[in-house]
């Protein structure tokens, strides 16, 4: 009986942990989905969305093969070469994640409170935390969504270099062979200083 009680208690703890992990993955997915939806509405081409163990591509769903992407990543690229248009499009793409996160946070916290649903409230708290972490402008190993939006609203070499990087990604994602890529963009990539901002977007 003692062993059965201990097993039951352990199983309950594992169930709680499993539910929290599922809520965390759902939170990552919601945030990245916001990027994708706003990106597509803005005119971007969708490539893939990864959250937790799953990767969603345009025509299939596969297992995520990279732990680096477990926390979520959304890949979309511009269809145009117009830098002003790309600037507006990428601003919406960057804003989409935090916007959907805060909307889901408010809805989850409200529904969870009025119907006394603890896990729905947890989902709301997690989405609110993701909103704060991504909306506040900062630059560490990666730029936050807020930092990207701030740069896109500014003027100068940093913004131009960032937009050129987006154009180069567009070339890389296209069916065109490397020898058909824009020589101007390739030259810009060669002369750009080596740092995290110029190897990740």
PLM regions with names:
Residues 187-196:
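Solenoid-like repeat scaffolds
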Residues 171-187:
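Helix-turn-helix repeat elements of alpha-solenoid scaffolds
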Residues 161-164, 195-201:
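Generic helix N-cap/helix-start motif at coil->alpha-helix transitions
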Residues 17-81:
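Small-residue-rich helix-interface/hinge motifs
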Residues 1-20:
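Topogenic membrane-insertion module of multi-pass membrane proteins
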Residues 7-11, 37-49, 111-118, 139-143:
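Membrane-interface elements of multi-pass transporters and channels
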Residues 82-172:
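Hydrophobic transmembrane alpha-helical segments that form the core helix bundle
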């Amino acid at each position: 009986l003692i062993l059965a009680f201990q097993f039951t208690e352990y199983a309950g703890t594992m169930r709680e942990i499993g539910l929290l992990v599922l809520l965390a993955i759902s939170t990552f997915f919601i945030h990245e989905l916001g990027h994708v939806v706003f990106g597509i509405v803005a005119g971007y081409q969708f490539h893939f969305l990864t959250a937790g163990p799953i990767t969603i591509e345009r025509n299939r769903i596969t297992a995520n093969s990279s732990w680096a992407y477990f926390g979520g990543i959304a890949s979309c690229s511009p269809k145009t070469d117009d830098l002003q248009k790309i600037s507006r499009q990428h601003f919406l793409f960057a804003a989409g994640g935090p916007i959907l996160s805060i909307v889901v946070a408010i809805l989850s916290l409200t529904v969870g409170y009025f119907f006394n649903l603890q896990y729905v409230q947890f989902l709301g708290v997690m989405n609110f935390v993701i909103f704060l972490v991504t909306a506040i402008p900062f630059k560490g190993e990666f730029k936050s969504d807020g930092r990207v939006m701030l740069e896109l609203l500014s003027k100068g070499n940093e913004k131009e270099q960032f937009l050129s990087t987006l154009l180069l990604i567009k070339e890389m994602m296209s069916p065109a062979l490397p020898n058909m890529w824009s020589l101007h963009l390739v030259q810009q990539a060669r002369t750009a200083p080596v740092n995290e901002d110029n190897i990740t977007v």
